[in-house]
C-alpha cells in the first residue's frame, strides 16, 4: 500500500495513523509516478484537483485552464490528498467511502 500526500496535510496524517503499514510518498519531495497519476486522472477526473485549496485560489484564470496533470506537476499541493494505491486500486481523499473500502469503517 502506498499513500501519496503531504506531511503537513491533516487528512494525510489521519490516513497514515490508520494505515501504519502504508509507505508514505511526499508529493513535494518525490512526486507521483506518471502512470499512477494518469490512472488517478482516468479514475477521478477533475476531482483529482483540489479547487478548495489556497494554492488553487492563488492561480490566475489562465493557469487554472491548464490540463490537470500539468497543474499537479507544477503545483503538487493542488492534488486532492491522500491518494492511496492498494493492490492496483486507487482511492482519493480520506472520507467515509475510502475508509470503508479499505476495511476501516
Where are these regions (language model features)?
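Thiol/selenol-based redox catalytic cores and closely related redox-interacting motifs
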Residues: 27-105
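Local sequence-structure signature of Cys/Sec-based thiol-disulfide redox active-site neighborhoods
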Residues: 1-30
Amino acid at each position: 500500500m502506498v499513500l501519496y500526500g503531504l506531511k503537513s496535510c491533516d487528512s494525510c496524517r489521519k490516513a497514515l495513523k490508520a494505515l501504519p503499514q502504508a509507505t508514505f510518498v511526499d508529493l513535494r519531495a518525490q512526486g507521483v509516478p506518471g502512470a499512477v497519476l494518469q490512472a488517478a486522472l482516468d479514475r477521478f477526473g477533475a476531482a483529482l484537483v483540489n479547487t478548495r485549496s489556497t494554492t488553487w485560489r492563488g492561480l490566475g484564470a489562465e493557469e487554472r485552464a491548464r490540463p490537470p496533470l500539468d497543474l499537479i506537476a507544477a503545483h503538487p499541493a493542488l492534488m486532492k490528498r491522500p491518494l492511496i494505491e492498494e493492490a492496483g486500486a486507487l482511492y482519493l481523499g480520506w472520507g467515509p467511502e475510502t475508509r470503508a473500502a479499505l476495511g476501516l469503517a
